[in-house]
UniProtKB/Swiss-Prot annotation:
Catalyzes the transfer of the phosphoribosyl group of 5-phosphorylribose-1-pyrophosphate (PRPP) to anthranilate to yield N-(5'-phosphoribosyl)-anthranilate (PRA). It is an enzyme of class 2 (transferase). HAMAP family: TrpD. Anthranilate 2 binds at R165. The keyword Transmembrane helix does not apply. Its EC number is 2.4.2.18. It comes from Bacillus thuringiensis subsp. konkukian (strain 97-27). This is Anthranilate phosphoribosyltransferase. Keywords: Amino-acid biosynthesis, Aromatic amino acid biosynthesis, Glycosyltransferase, Magnesium, Metal-binding, Transferase, Tryptophan biosynthesis. Pathway: Amino-acid biosynthesis; L-tryptophan biosynthesis; L-tryptophan from chorismate: step 2/5. GO terms for cellular component: cytosol.
Length: 341
């Protein structure tokens, strides 16, 4: 590890292979916590490259719980977190809208790291059993159309690093790579990131991971979601080509909403917001979810245009299908799935 630390101190980038090996060392129980913390802070200070991100993703996926290869057509819409905006759980709420629109959603997530309420905290509050095994997740994806993958359970080797991340209390490369380490072999992906300069590197990693289509967004105000506040910077991966562009919410009929207007709270408060959105209540929360779910449906290919995606998202909510997916997941995730274990 000392060689890698020395390179980072000198501001040098690591190669993909060096980062892969460093990643395996980070997961080694014999490495000191102080070395892990130093590595993460130095890497953040230097700035992460696409090669470094992909190298670490390789190491983490190698050490993750194994999943069957026959899960086909799944999507994730997990964001990086780390934007400090304390918004409600936009991507988790949107996940049920996607599922209601017929997308198979493998939602990768965690408890709160830099926010008040993480996706796991919200889902637990809503009554979802977040401790599903790979076999149970496979079953849920097939029969419910949505499953939650609790990151610490999927990546047991990350237990120590989670503790260190919490103590550091600053975004690290692990915020960036969270959405990239989903152990399910995803076909498409929608990723919100908090660092605008990482849009292209993250899209390049998604390309290396074999995604057929993907959309990476940095929202107005550096939100790790698409924002109704103003211009959103976007990178689209389609047909193995990467295109950079920007998206204005007004073009799609939305009124401007400041990021402060969509702040969330604790898990109880955020659960109330999510249930309100999925029940069809008109609000700035609903509009934010429609925008994000619409973009995700476009990224998935379910919608040919963003406009069509927003229309499909609205239908998913207003038809009751999105809320039905939540209720199905609550029921199915709490069953004794002995037949699949």
């Amino acid at each position: 590890m000392n060689n890698y630390l020395r390179k980072l101190v000198e501001g040098q980038h690591l190669t993909e292979e060096e980062m892969y090996k460093a990643g395996l060392l980070l997961l080694n129980e014999n490495i000191l916590e102080s070395e892990i913390a130093a590595f993460l802070v130095l890497l953040k200070a230097k700035g992460e490259t696409a090669e470094e991100i992909y190298g670490l993703v390789r190491a983490l996926r190698e050490k993750a719980l194994p999943f069957s290869n026959h899960i086909q057509g799944a999507m994730d819409n997990c964001g990086t977190g780390g934007d400090g905006a304390q918004t409600f759980n936009i991507s988790t709420t949107s996940a049920f809208v996607l599922a209601g629109a017929g997308v198979k959603v493998a939602k990768h997530g965690n408890r709160a790291v830099s926010s008040k309420t993480g996706s796991a905290d919200l889902l637990e509050e809503l009554g979802v059993n977040i401790s599903s095994t790979p076999n149970e997740i496979d079953y849920l994806l097939k029969h419910v159309g949505i499953a939650f993958l609790f990151a610490p359970a999927m990546h047991p080797a990350l237990k120590r690093i989670m503790k260190i991340r919490k103590e550091l209390n600053v975004p690290t490369i692990f915020n960036l790579i969270g959405p990239l380490t989903n152990p399910v072999n995803l076909e498409t992906q929608f990723v919100g990131i908090y660092k605008r300069d990482m849009l292209l590197p993250v899209a390049q990693v998604l390309q290396k991971l074999g995604r057929k289509q993907a959309l990476v967004v940095n929202g107005s105000g550096f939100l790790d979601e698409a924002s109704l506040q103003g211009e959103n910077h976007v990178v689209i991966l389609k047909d193995n080509e990467i295109v950079e562009t920007s998206i204005e919410p007004e073009k799609y009929g939305f009124s401007i909403v400041k990021n402060e207007e969509i702040r969330g709270g604790n898990s109880k408060e955020n659960a109330k917001i999510t249930l309100g959105v999925l029940s069809g209540e008109k609000s700035v929360y609903r509009d934010t979810v429609l925008f994000n779910a619409g973009l995700a449906l476009f990224a998935n290919g379910k919608a040919k245009t963003i406009e069509e995606g927003i229309t499909l998202a609205a239908h998913s909510i207003d038809s009751g299908k999105a809320l039905a997916k939540l209720n199905l997941l609550i029921a199915a995730s709490n069953e004794k799935l002995e037949r699949v274990n």
